[in-house]
Amino acid sequence: MRKILFLVVFLGLGLAQSEGAKVYSANCQTCHQANGQGLPGAFPPLTHLDKVVQAKGGRAYLIRVVLYGLQGPLTVGGKTFNGVMPPFRQLKDREVAAVLNHVLAVFAKSKAKPFTPEEVKAQRARAFSPQKALKSRPPVK
């Protein structure tokens, strides 16, 4: 009986979603899809973000994207996307950090240090438009 109880608890914990996964599912998945591959011609994939986060200014840029959205042409993997990503300023600082950590770990397979709520708070204190957020994107190869 004890083994069965342990197995049920263990499996239940394994199925529990992280906060980042929950935020992604509720706010990002519709456009970027459950697998982070996006929709061709409409919404870019998120699998390349390790290159972005490693670039100078990349961490701040990714936070700005979530907080302020994006508007204007964006080239990812040789393909241009020209849509609008809405801002998600309603998310708490810890939720923004969690969703970025989820995306980087799961889709980009990044080993970048985790984002913190303090980093998000620092970017939230600055005013950016979706167009200005896009212009702050670091060059990536």
Task: List the predicted regions and their residue ranges.
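Gly/Gly-Pro-rich "capping" loops immediately C-terminal to redox-active cysteine motifs
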Residues: 38-75, 82-91
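Positively charged n-region of N-terminal signal peptides that target proteins for export
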Residues: 1-4
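Flexible coil segments in periplasmic/lumen-exposed cytochrome c-class electron-transfer proteins
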Residues: 76-77, 83, 88-141
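Solvent-exposed, acidic/flexible segments
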Residues: 17, 39, 59, 92-96, ...
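The canonical Cys-X-X-Cys-His
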Residues: 24-34, 85, 99-102
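Electrostatic cytochrome c docking/interface patches
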Residues: 10-24, 38-39, 50-54, 134-135
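Stable alpha-helical elements in mature extracytoplasmic
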Residues: 19-24, 58, 62, 95-96, ...
